[in-house]
């Protein structure tokens, strides 16, 4: 034979409440410890624990008289206790429903504008195209950095250094004139210096061939 299954806590609580309802009497703990095992099958070791759980839930009343504690519970008391408990559960259910509704509204609001549609796809394509144009403009800006004042100043300083180097080579007034001319052409026309030494530029160095030679050596 299989071993008989013991009572659950709720079953013990229910059977102990039957003791109070059937007798409509007041008991001490020692009285319940005698009655519960015999009439309701509640183990003696669990009587005190079950009784205290009923007191904690306001299903059983208790009062200390002298050195003894007395316990009682009437059907009307249990009815009111169950009614209060039912009201608490209904309130919790209502609060939970309201919370669920608020969360669902928040979720629906968050979804607005994220649904996939033709207009959204077109906007995404336009955004991608604009990003591509932005990247292309960055490349173009890098190409025109020569027009930046800082870059021009850097070129000017390099030209001055080159002029001084050529002056050291030529050591003459004509060399300075030649370099000044070339510097002016380079900055205003943004063309290489060597271009202004060619015959097509209209410049005729004449007897300054040696000077031109030193100049080309200096800038090469």
UniProtKB/Swiss-Prot annotation:
What's an example GO cellular component term for this entry? Answer: nucleus
Name the SUPFAM superfamilies for this protein. Winged helix' DNA-binding domain
Q: Name one GO molecular function term.
A: double-stranded DNA binding
Q: What is its main location?
A: nucleus
Keyword Metal-binding: yes or no?
no
Describe the family membership recorded for this protein in Swiss-Prot or TrEMBL: Belongs to the MND1 family.
Entry protein name: Meiotic nuclear division protein 1 homolog
Q: Which gene encodes it?
A: mnd1
């Amino acid at each position: 034979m299989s071993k008989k299954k013991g009572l659950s806590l709720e079953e013990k609580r229910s059977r102990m409440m039957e003791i109070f309802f059937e007798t409509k009497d007041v008991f001490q703990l020692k009285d319940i410890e005698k009655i519960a095992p015999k009439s309701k099958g509640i183990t003696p070791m669990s009587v005190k624990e079950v009784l205290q759980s009923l007191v904690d839930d306001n299903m059983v009343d208790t009062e200390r008289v002298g050195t003894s504690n007395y316990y009682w519970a009437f059907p009307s008391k249990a009815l009111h206790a169950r009614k209060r408990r039912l009201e608490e559960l209904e309130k919790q259910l209502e609060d939970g429903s309201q919370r669920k509704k608020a969360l669902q509204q928040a979720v629906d609001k968050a979804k607005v504008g994220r649904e996939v549609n033709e207009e959204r796809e077109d906007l995404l394509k336009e955004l991608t195209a604009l990003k591509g144009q932005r990247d292309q403009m960055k490349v173009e800006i890098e190409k025109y950095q020569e027009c930046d004042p800082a870059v021009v100043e850097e070129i000017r300083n390099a030209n001055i250094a080159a002029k001084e180097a050529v002056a050291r080579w030529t050591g003459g007034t004509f060399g300075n004139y030649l370099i000044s001319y070339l510097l002016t052409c380079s900055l205003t026309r943004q063309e290489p210096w060597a271009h202004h030494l060619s015959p097509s530029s209209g410049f005729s160095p004449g007897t300054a061939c040696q000077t031109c030679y030193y100049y080309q050596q200096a800038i090469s």
